[in-house]
Every structure is written in structure tokens, then in C-alpha cells.
Amino acid sequence: MAKASNTAAQRVRKKVKKNVAEGVVHVHASFNNTIITITDRQGNALAWATSGGQGFKGSRKSTPFAAQVAAESAGRVAMEYGVKNLEVRIKGPGPGRESAVRALHGLGIKITAISDVTPIPHNGCRPPKRRRI
């Protein structure tokens, strides 16, 4: 019985944090929420944060301030991995697009490139009908 507990103790290893100098920030800004994912060059996720995960609920999730708080949270975790330079890829029409980039710049991370990768349909699916309030 003692051997079983010894092998269980040996299996537990401390996770080694990899040191990544350059990364890519994927900012997905929808009308309802903002999702920020920081990956390495190969696309492996290092850190992520959302406006809803930062405690904002309902219509407050879709504010620029909520996107700023989420970007700061993800940026701090990425800095623990040694990230110094980031390339930003923005997707979506939401209000948190610009404030997320400004928040990352404010943390002291160098932004090397900003690109808009919003998918634009070549007359694909029919969009939802207009809201009448």
C-alpha cells in the first residue's frame, strides 16, 4: 500500500513555464462581449480573458472599459511568460476593439503590428433583420 502512495507523489510535477519573447494577441470584439487570447507564434494559448470573466454582466460586458480590464488581466499573465512584443489581430465590430489594444500598450508591452482580420462575407448568409424599438 505504501508503494502506491509513493508513485502518486512522484507523478505530481511542477509545471514549467516556458519563456516566450514574442506573441500574438487575438481580440474578438463582438457586440455582447470581448474575448482576448494571447498565444505564442505557433498558436498555443498562453493567457486569455473575457469581459464577462472579469465580473461584468449583461450590457456592461460590451463596454470599452470591460475590454480594457480583460486585456490588462490577460497581459499580466502573458508577462509572467516573458512576453515583450505582441502582434495584435482584431476580429469583430464590437466597442472593445481599440481600448483592448491601448490597455496592452499601457502595460509596457511593445505592439509590433495591428491587423484587422474581421471575416467579411462575399454575400454569404443573410444578416438578421433590423431591430425596431
From Swiss-Prot:
Residue ranges that the Swiss-Prot or TrEMBL entry lists as coiled coil: none
Alphabetical keyword list: Ribonucleoprotein, Ribosomal protein, RNA-binding, rRNA-binding
A GO molecular function held by the record: structural constituent of ribosome
InterPro entries: Ribosomal_uS11, Ribosomal_uS11_bac-type, Ribosomal_uS11_CS, Ribosomal_uS11_sf
Cellular component GO terms held in the UniProt record: ribonucleoprotein complex; ribosome
Gene3D superfamilies given in the database record: Ribosomal protein S11 (3.30.420.80)
Function of the protein: Located on the platform of the 30S subunit, it bridges several disparate RNA helices of the 16S rRNA. Forms part of the Shine-Dalgarno cleft in the 70S ribosome.
Protein family per UniProt: Belongs to the universal ribosomal protein uS11 family.
Complexes and interactors: Part of the 30S ribosomal subunit. Interacts with proteins S7 and S18. Binds to IF-3.
Protein name, as recorded: Small ribosomal subunit protein uS11
Lineage of the species this protein comes from: Bacteria, Pseudomonadati, Pseudomonadota, Betaproteobacteria, Burkholderiales
